[in-house]
Regions:
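Bacterial N-terminal signal peptides that target proteins for export
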Residues: 1-10
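N-terminal signal peptide c-region/cleavage motif recognized by signal peptidases
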Residues: 13-21
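Conserved beta-strand hairpin/beta-sheet module of binuclear metal-dependent hydrolase folds
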Residues: 24-73, 171-180
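Extracytoplasmic
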Residues: 26, 41, 76, 83, ...
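A mature extracytoplasmic/lumenal domain signature
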Residues: 33-35, 57-60, 82-87, 110-112, ...
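Active-site environment of divalent metal-dependent phosphoester hydrolases
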Residues: 38-40, 61-63, 86-91, 113-116, ...
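Active-site HxH/HxHxD metal-binding segment of metal-dependent hydrolases
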Residues: 73-151
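Ligand/cofactor pocket segment of small-molecule handling proteins
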Residues: 141-180
C-alpha cells in the first residue's frame, strides 16, 4: 500500500512531468539575405506554440520586408524584437518591422541602446545615401531590457555578453534547446 507521502510524491512527479511535456519545444528559423544585402546579418525567429521573439531586425528595408513575410507565414504572434548589437545592420529594419507588428516590444541591453544613441545620426548620414530605397524612413531606438533574459511561453532566453569586454555586442542562449 502507498502511504500518503508516497502518493503525494508520485502525484507531484506526475504533474511536473506533465507540465514539462506541455511546454512546446522552442524552434528556430534563421533568415539571412546572403549576397542580396550589403550586410548579410542573420535574424532568428524563436517560436513557441503561439508566440515568437525575433532576434535582430536586418539592415535594409527590403530585407526587413522579407523578414515580415517570414514572420507572418509562421502564424506566430510576435511579442518581442530583441536587438543584440548597436550597429545599424542589426536595427535599421525596425521601422519596417514595427509598422507590421506594432504590438511587439523592441528591447536591447543598455550598452546597445547607448551605442545606438551615440552613433545613429552619423550611421544614417553615411549609409542612407548608399541604401537608396532600402533606407529606413525613420530610425527607432529600442527600450532598455530589464535584466539579462527574455521569456517566451515560460521558457528563458538568456542574454549573454553583457558583463564581457564588449557589452554592446550580446547574444542569446536558449538553454531548453541548447542553442545560440
Amino acid at each position: 500500500m502507498f502511504s500518503t507521502f508516497k502518493r503525494l510524491t508520485l502525484a507531484t512527479a506526475a504533474l511536473a512531468f506533465a507540465a514539462h511535456a506541455a511546454a512546446a519545444e522552442l524552434k528556430l528559423d534563421v533568415y539571412n539575405p546572403g549576397e542580396a544585402a550589403i550586410f548579410p546579418v542573420s535574424s532568428v525567429l524563436v517560436s513557441g506554440e503561439k508566440d515568437a521573439i525575433l532576434v535582430d531586425a536586418q539592415f535594409g528595408k527590403g530585407q526587413a520586408e522579407q523578414l515580415v513575410q517570414k514572420i507572418r507565414a509562421s502564424s506566430k504572434r510576435l511579442t518581442t524584437i530583441y536587438i543584440s548589437h548597436g550597429d545599424p545592420d542589426y536595427y535599421f529594419g525596425l521601422d519596417t518591422l514595427t509598422a507590421a507588428f506594432p504590438d511587439a516590444k523592441v528591447l536591447a541591453p543598455q550598452p546597445v541602446v547607448d551605442h545606438i544613441n551615440a552613433t545613429v545620426a552619423d550611421k544614417l548620414a553615411f549609409w542612407g545615401p548608399k541604401m537608396g530605397a532600402d533606407k529606413p524612413a525613420k530610425t527607432l531606438v529600442p527600450q532598455v531590457l530589464k535584466g539579462h533574459s527574455l521569456t517566451l511561453e515560460g521558457q528563458q532566453l538568456e542574454v549573454v555578453g553583457l558583463d564581457g569586454p564588449q557589452p554592446d555586442r550580446s547574444f542569446v542562449w536558449i538553454p531548453s534547446i541548447k542553442a545560440v
